Amino acid sequence: MMNMNKLFKRIALAVTLLTAAALAPAEETDICSPFRDGKVDESLLATMLSAADDGHLFRIQQQSSMVGFCVDSKLSRIEGIFREFKGGMAFDSEENGTGQTMVLIKADSLDTEGNMVESMIKGESFFDVEHYPEVLFTSNGFHWTGADTAVLKGDLTLRGITKPVVFTVTLTALDDNQVKDAQKILVKATTTINRADFGMKKLTTLVNNDVQLCMSVEALKYGS
């Protein structure tokens, strides 16, 4: 049974959200709004809301963050970044296995250095943004490997195909606190996927199969 202190905290959070709703757009006050409508399991949303309640939720700040990829080709190294994405990270800095991360990317916001390359990557041979407008990552395991390093396991959904991935993560406090007490953090995460696993099986003689995914995101503790 929920103790009284926990109940009062949830009531206070609800009052705060209702007050903010009168001053800001609905999407800004609903911390899980980008992930509703069946995008993720309701239990994951509950975890994020509980983390907000407990003070363990960090929201990604899009303007000061980067989400992208790089892949080698016969001609050059192809690098791309996504301009539109939302998400958050919920974790207890002193416990393993209690974290949850969700990131939703607008595939059509992809930006590369050249229009021809960008059109190719957005096209049906690769991201096929017309039919698959979003890329989704949801985690199912977070394990600290050091004071500021961790492993993040989860599922990546790309082109309608979901596969497990493992990110190597480094966290840095962006204030005068340690990571565990920080109000704002920098999270860098990388992993490598095989594009063929996600249905990108064309142009294999031109573009490598291995694609590195990378994130460098600033995240602000919810309520700060």
Question: Which sequence ranges carry the predicted segments?
Answer:
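Low-complexity, acidic/polar, glycine-enriched regions of mature
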Residues: 25-224
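N-terminal signal peptide c-region/cleavage motif recognized by signal peptidases
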Residues: 19-21
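Bacterial N-terminal signal peptides that target proteins for export
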Residues: 3-12
